[in-house]
Amino acid sequence: MTKYIVQGGHPLFGEVEISGAKNAAVAIIPAALLVDGVCRIENIPQISDVTLSLKILEHLGAGIRVINRHTVEIDASRIRSTRTSYELARKMRASYYLIGSLLGRFGQAEVAMPGGCNFGVRPIDQHVKGFTALGAKVMVEGGFINASTETGRLKGANIYLDVVSVGATMNIMMAAVRAEGNTVIENAAKEPHIVDLANFLNSMGANIRGAGTDTIKIQGVDRLRGGSYAIIPDQIEAGTYMAAVAATGGQILVKNIIPKHMDCITAKLVEMGVEVEEREDTLLVRRSGPLQKANVKTMPYPGFPTDMQPQITTVLCLAEGTSLVTESVWNNRYRYVDEFRRMGAHIQVDGKVAVIEGVPALTGAPVHACDLRAGAALVIAALAAKGESEISCVQYIERGYEDIVTKLQGLGASIRTVEVPGESEELEAHIG
């Protein structure tokens, strides 16, 4: 098992390059199955979820050619199966995007029940509602989600999502892109990676309008051609480094970003006393004075992202006064709080609300990551804390952060990896 050893208490200085967006990549890679030709995908992040996604496609019969560290070519012209590997697909939540892509192209899909981060029930009822409206029959049998059509092709429909769901919006979009006729998705999610998926599909010949609004209109096409596409920068990775310098103090230049995507995060950090200077594709982030209390509520985009909730909570642990964090997107996303308490944080949780009494400093401690974003938050806490911290279960962090140790070292952080023999790193299906 790999662990991180962090000597905290050092401010961060320097530049950090942001990788391609994880949440876009894990949808765009399955979407390549909808294309009859070869897709060249650039700016792919080097993270374990991407590696797993490519392995799943390869198991289905897709040709995978690695051009360089951040570019792959996917040839889905010779797919030999619509049934995913149980052992591979169960390890990640995003494997459910294979239902939409396989169903959209072949009219059938058998996908193992997905895993992912264990911070609440991850229902796929809105996905199923959309697939059913498009003419599919969906059942769960033997640990697999089986979806099929009688005619082999879906038919366009009007679909209203009962709740704003990023996953359902993207999955239905993929299923509908090659359906017969027109599809309208109402109450759609608006996240940047939804727009990125739509742009990818449109670049391959799809006809999708309205991505980024609450109504998406899709005119089905018979086929998609091959082409090249570059994934957008990762909003959450950028926000994580911004939160890190907010917690430790210092000044960093966050490079390769889309500033508009960062507005919801930037606004809250500025409220807390962090200075942020926006440039064309960079943000200069500086924190020299004391942190101020703030109230944060997670919301669908363009609101404050749930994937940044643990990281902003870390910063608020060091702010003067009492702060409130309300988690309105997922249940049980405060599982990391006990680990923070080991480091001296004062946090009380009542349902969806965390009450945070700021402390002058955190202290190093042995802690373990319980999911991807909580793990990143623990890294931030360890960087800001006095003394040494040991973070275990870091494989969850590496699901979504490319070269996090190297990037932090480049900012002056004292962080290193150590290998502990005899301990398993296997990700359980329900944990991320």
Each model region followed by its residue ranges:
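Short, structured segments at the rim of ligand-binding sites
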Residues: M1-G432
